[in-house]
Design a protein with these regions (language model features):
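Metal-dependent phosphoesterase core characteristic of DEDDh/y 3'-5' exonuclease domains
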Residues: 1-96, 101-104, 109, 113-114, ...
Length: 121
């Protein structure tokens, strides 16, 4: 979720800062293709067609999870904003559990998108 807008650019820039070679440049692919990368944030906003207003405005993963009855990664009280403090406190298990909830929610949302929205022509 939001891989095109955050995850992939973050990984590229972080790799550059740490002098870690980027082994593949085109992880994102063509913007309007859903292979090899499907950015659910773009899919659920229909590529931002209505800008910041209207039915297709951009919401976060937590919003879509709640809207579609999927357990949100934030349901246990941890958010992405907590990661730095959890890391400083050595709470690696809490971080791992949050990441696992995030992956599970993203997979469930992807499956929902694939069955209910992906086939719209």
């Amino acid at each position: 979720f939001n891989g095109r807008g955050f995850d992939v650019p973050f990984l590229y820039l972080r790799s550059a800062l740490l002098n870690v070679a980027i082994t593949k440049k085109n992880w994102l692919g063509y913007r309007f293709a859903t292979e090899p990368h499907c950015d659910l944030a773009e899919q659920f906003t229909f590529y931002g067609v209505s800008g910041r207003e209207g039915a297709a405005r951009r919401f976060n993963l937590d919003f879509y999870c709640k809207a579609f009855g999927i357990d949100s990664p934030k349901s246990q009280g941890v958010t992405g904003m907590d990661i730095n403090s959890l890391l400083a406190e050595g709470r690696y298990r809490d971080i791992a559990e949050y990441c696992l909830r995030d992956v599970r929610a993203t997979v469930e949302l992807y499956r929902l998108w694939k069955t209910r929205l992906a086939g719209i022509k």
